[in-house]
């Protein structure tokens, strides 16, 4: 993981308005140490349906090999938006405008993100840090909270300073098992929060910003992920995937 020194001047669309923004230096997750990757691609920025494929490699110098068959997923109800953590920009923008991921935009983040923990409604074996959901388990989406973009137990966090959160156990079947996606890991205010892999409502309905799939595939992912292999989610529209495939050394997809 390296800090890149290039600074780009670009136009971003936030809350429907185009603004000029010069980003500070950001960390790009090159996942040099990753041995597991979940690749999610969509047709374009606005498409809700997409495809996921698992990959693994034996060493950091090995070629990525696909694991099992690809399967369908859905992303945010409004498609994808570029993560503010990345300072390299895609060329396949929407009419020259680049949508950046923001809180409450109904879009899933595009980029490369660590997969850091698993949650479930019941106890289960896990090779990632595990959280069993309780009535008091919440993911905080209040941008003014010190716990913004964290899964917490409201009775143990200490400073209960938020006015908005997701009561995870009450979500029901869609959160029977899921994975925390470390998007906005620096917890930049308004950069987006509570992004998960989880079970979908159905194959047509987009999410509030997560990536969702059939229960059997979510279970398979939860059993497969291993913290020792530094797993990542690589999530991009197909044209952006092709743009960065060589530079970021992304897994080769079947045509």
Stretch-by-stretch model annotation:
Residues 1-21:
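Bacterial Sec-dependent N-terminal signal peptides
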């Amino acid at each position: 993981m390296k800090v890149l020194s290039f600074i780009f001047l670009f136009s971003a669309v936030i809350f429907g308005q185009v603004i000029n923004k010069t980003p500070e230096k950001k960390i790009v997750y090159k996942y040099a140490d990753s041995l597991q990757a979940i690749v999610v691609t969509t047709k374009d920025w606005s498409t809700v349906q997409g495809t996921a494929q698992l990959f693994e490699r034996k060493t950091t110098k090995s070629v990525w090999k696909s694991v099992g068959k690809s399967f369908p997923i859905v992303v945010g109800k409004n498609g994808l938006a570029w993560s503010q953590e990345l300072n390299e920009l895609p060329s396949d923008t929407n009419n020259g405008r680049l949508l950046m991921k923001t809180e409450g935009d109904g879009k899933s983040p595009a980029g490369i993100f660590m997969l850091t923990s698993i949650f479930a409604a019941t106890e289960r074996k896990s090779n990632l840090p595990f959280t069993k959901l309780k009535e008091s388990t919440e993911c905080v989406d209040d941008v003014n909270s010190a716990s913004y973009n964290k899964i917490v137990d409201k009775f143990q966090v200490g400073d209960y300073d938020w006015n908005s959160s997701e009561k995870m156990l009450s979500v029901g079947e869609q959160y029977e098992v899921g994975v925390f996606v470390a998007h906005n890991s620096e917890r930049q205010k308004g950069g987006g929060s509570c992004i998960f892999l989880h079970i979908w409502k159905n194959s047509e309905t987009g999410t509030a910003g997560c990536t969702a799939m059939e229960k059997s595939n979510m279970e398979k992912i939860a059993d497969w992920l291993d913290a020792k292999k530094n797993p990542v989610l690589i999530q991009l529209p197909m044209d952006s995937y092709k743009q960065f495939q060589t530079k970021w050394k992304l897994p080769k997809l079947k045509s």
